[in-house]
A protein has these predicted regions:
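PLD/PLD-like phosphodiesterase catalytic module centered on the HKD motif
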Residues: 3-4, 14-184
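C-terminal active-site-proximal or functional interface alpha/beta core segments in diverse enzymes
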Residues: 10
Length: 184
């Protein structure tokens, strides 16, 4: 990827693929990733946020308690898709039954479809992937919230200090603002 990267993966990624998804320390590619199982890339990095599905043990107010009843295993994300450079005129969508693992690539009869330059296809995939990503990022943040207890009430700030992170160079929020909203 030269500009941005969104991915949803199931499990057991090849080391080379995991390394490529993580990227280098000095690149400014924005990355969003959702993996079914926690790995070394889970969390927030300089230009990226990676999350895993979180099963909430207790219900949130107004929601039912969740259950794995009737489900075999712990697969919550089984979408296997990588989209690169989706905000450009030359995106690439990689999708199929291959889960980017060694066995899928070497011994299983799996497939991958590579769609290049089709902005409409990239838009559709990224929209669905970001829907899943935002949903599970909320759950991941609730599940990994430090301190536990009830979070404080959210209120509007009386001044504009809440915007500081969007103007701090090298922050993910800065790169998101510049990339998706407007140049400085």
């Amino acid at each position: 990827a030269r500009r941005d990267l969104v991915f949803c993966t199931a499990f057991n990624l090849l080391d080379e693929i995991e390394e490529a998804l993580l990227g280098g320390e000095d690149d400014d590619v924005i990355r969003y990733g959702l993996q079914n199982t926690k790995s070394r890339i889970t969390g927030t990095h300089r230009h990226a946020r990676f999350v895993t599905p979180a099963f909430l043990d207790s219900g949130l107010e107004g929601f039912l308690k969740e259950s794995y009843a009737g489900q075999e295993g712990n697969i919550l994300i089984h979408l296997k898709t990588i989209v690169t450079d989706f905000s450009t005129a030359s995106p690439t969508v990689i999708t199929g039954s291959n889960n980017f693992s060694r066995s899928a690539s070497a011994s299983n009869d799996e497939n991958l479809l590579i769609i290049s330059g089709e902005t409409a296809a990239a838009d559709i995939y990224v929209t669905e992937m970001m829907r899943l990503y935002d949903h599970y990022r909320f759950r991941y943040n609730i599940k990994t919230r430090s301190g536990g207890g009830t979070p404080g009430r959210l209120v509007l700030a009386a001044d504009d200090h809440w915007t500081d992170r969007y103007y701090a160079p090298q922050s993910l929020e800065y790169y998101e603002r510049v990339r998706f909203c407007a140049p400085e």
